[in-house]
Amino acid sequence: QKKSAWVSQVTLYGYLKTRMGAKYVLMFEDEIFLGSINKAKWNIYSVALQDLTFYAISFLKNIRNQHDTEKANEIYFQILDNELQKNEMPNEIYENAKKKFLERYQNINWNEYHESLPFNTSALSLYEWSPIAEELKSLDKKIVLNSMILKWDNVKKEFICLLYTSD
């Protein structure tokens, strides 16, 4: 949960800061823009959380022979419910995240997910939801996607290291 929030927020705010330059601080006084950032933040985070949940369960299933893939539902919905109740995740985003999670869950290949661009969906979500003009975003697509993927690579390394040091 914390890693998903960290990756999504660091990449979103980093992208905004890079794109806006000196105006970055001033934009936080604009209520409309703040609303856009909040909407983007929650949408990106909900997908990042899906990616990390699916990655962890797929990895454990294949590397540790743990076959309880239903745990993905329990983990994701427990965290999402907590975000709704304690952190004021917007209800519309909450409902949409649940729906998208279930769609992805039904179609996931647990044997391959952890090895087949497991964080691509959240990187695309960062690109889609960032409140940046489309003509500028199109110039940044590769950089934006790579920035998130590189952060996820660090999370994957930490996860694997934790698993093997706990043996």
PLM-predicted stretches and their roles:
Residues K141-L162:
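Preference for long, well-ordered alpha-helical segments
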